[in-house]
Amino acid sequence: MNLPLIDVVIPCYNTEQTLVRAVESVLQQNNLGHLWLIDDASTDNTFALALQLAAQYPNRISVEQMPKNCGVAMARNWGAMLSAKSAVDFVAFLDADDAYEPGALEVAAVTFHFQTDTSVVRLALKPINLAQRYAEHPNFDQAWQYMRMTCGGNIVFNKAFFFACGGFPTHQLFRELGGEDGALGIATTKTAKVATLFEDVGVLHFCREGMHAERLLDGLLFGKQDPAITAEKMAEAEQVTSTICRRIEALKCGLNSAEIGIRPLVVERTE
């Protein structure tokens, strides 16, 4: 069976302690196309380490460095743009402090191969070393469902659909508060087929105190709301999602037109 290949983008910022683990988990995937490491102007040895890894696997890994720290959304988007020059039709995003389980990309490739109308695949997201206050909460499974549907590190896109969405939103709002992956993730579920593979192999999500997911879990499980997330900013984020949806629907309208080809038109003007 000739399953499709999948390019992988890993955004990196001060991740020298975990990058090797993430990269090794990607390289063991049978359906890997090419791996792009995008250093977001790290201040530690991440970039040097990435170059070392690329030197070991020159045909499988490419490294780029952002000219300044631009945030994870921009780093992901830049990696996807670089991957666009390959013949591979799909791109996955993995965080530098997480890791794929063996066979993770294969289950995504199988899905795209047999379910050709799939635009997005969501891999299983498995928390490792999650604090007991979350893991033992009676509503944890429900809260984690939201996490794995909005996280940026367990998602695989049809590249054409990803670019049609405009990539991950890079608005200043998300630089301040995070959530760009959520804004895009919600838009995908409103405009396209999103296949979830939550009962299969996927992504090991290594947890730590202070991680971004804590804010989400604190809100969902304990009702703790970040005072920085105001109603106005929530409305702004929702508007970003709405804009992505509007653009996709407009694109569908054009692509589904029965009038394919050159159609000479004349504009009539009235006084």
What are these regions (language model features)?
Residues 174-184:
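Acidic donor-binding loop at a coil-to-helix junction in glycosyltransferase catalytic cores
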Residues 24-33:
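Short, acidic, metal-binding catalytic loop of nucleotide-sugar glycosyltransferases
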Residues 25, 39-49, 68, 98:
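A conserved acidic beta->alpha catalytic loop
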